[in-house]
């Protein structure tokens, strides 16, 4: 399942991804497209999207459904962390349909083999969010209450800049250090001011914010293009709209999700767009962290137009 089967645009496609995409198309075609025409957007599809049922035109579609069949493939392949099935549904506004147009989102945990519990979280715009936990040993499903952290500081909490892959991890670490130093001051002898968790799954990171496990997460990899170019390197894999198609859930639970400029996410629903995003558990955390984050990336000339 860890064999690479496609390394084109978007993320690397592993064998496990290919299997999930085939199942996805059949499921959407049978359960949804048999009732209403839709545009399915997912990595691995020819051209990045397909209109279902077959033979329908894109202009006829009522909905655009963007899916990441397995977000967190690498951690799941090696049985390190759960992965997630991410789905966002927006009215079909053509190619200009954006993340901000998504009306319904759902993410479902794909547990490790040794793990018997898995969560599903979903939200309709303006109606809050709900969550359930499934016990695959007993078949029992129970409602769970997920709440973001109410802490007013990142001190003694999980807070991090994502730096999953090589290239400019040193730059990202410098930014991380500047933010923490600005927010918490100099390290104290024998103490850990805050901690990090490099969860290679955007859906997983959003879940950690939703569940109150993380207080601050920023994935600003797209802003590193210049720094990598100066080193003679190409920009490596970044976050894409399908990775963020469930951010509606986080917002419905009062998690603050922005782009690098502090604005709501507004990327078009596509497979190629590189997206930078920042998540804060609450307003106090944003007030504590955002000025230092903005200062750090601005002084490096990293902000995009």
PLM feature segments, named:
Residues 7-13, 71-75, 194-196, 234-237:
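A short glycine/serine-rich beta->alpha loop
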Residues 24, 28, 85, 89, ...:
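Buried hydrophobic packing segments
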Residues 29, 80-83, 217:
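Hydrophobic alpha-helical membrane context
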Residues 29-37, 91-97, 112-113, 182-190:
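Alpha-helix termini
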Residues 56-57, 100-102, 108-305:
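An extended, acidic
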């Amino acid at each position: 399942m860890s064999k690479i089967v496609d390394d084109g645009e978007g993320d690397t496609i592993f064998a496990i991804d290919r299997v999930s995409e085939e199942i996805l198309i059949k499921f959407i075609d049978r359960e949804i497209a048999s009732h209403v025409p839709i545009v399915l957007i997912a990595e691995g599809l020819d051209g990045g999207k397909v209109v279902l049922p077959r033979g329908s035109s894109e202009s006829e579609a009522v909905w655009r459904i963007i899916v990441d069949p397995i977000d967190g493939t690498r951690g799941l392949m090696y049985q390190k962390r759960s992965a997630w099935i991410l789905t966002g549904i927006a009215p079909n506004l053509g190619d200009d349909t954006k993340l901000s147009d998504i009306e319904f989102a759902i993410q479902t945990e794909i547990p490790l083999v040794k793990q018997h519990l898995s969560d599903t979280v979903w939200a309709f715009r303006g109606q809050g969010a709900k969550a359930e936990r499934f016990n695959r040993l007993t078949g029992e499903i129970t409602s769970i209450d997920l709440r973001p952290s109410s802490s007013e500081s990142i001190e003694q909490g999980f807070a991090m800049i994502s730096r999953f892959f090589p290239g400019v991890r040193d730059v990202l670490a410098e930014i991380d250090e500047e933010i923490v130093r600005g927010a918490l001051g100099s390290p104290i002898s024998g103490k850990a001011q805050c901690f990090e968790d490099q969860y290679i799954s955007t859906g997983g990171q959003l879940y950690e914010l939703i569940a109150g496990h993380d207080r601050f997460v920023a994935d600003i990899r797209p802003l590193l293009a210049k720094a990598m170019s100066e080193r003679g390197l190409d920009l490596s894999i970044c976050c894409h709209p399908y990775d963020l198609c469930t951010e509606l859930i986080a917002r419905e639970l009062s998690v603050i999700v922005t782009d690098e400029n502090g604005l709501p996410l507004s990327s078009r629903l596509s497979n190629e767009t590189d997206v930078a995003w920042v998540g804060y558990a609450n307003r106090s955390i944003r007030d504590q962290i955002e000025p230092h984050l903005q200062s750090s990336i601005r002084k490096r000339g990293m902000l995009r137009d």
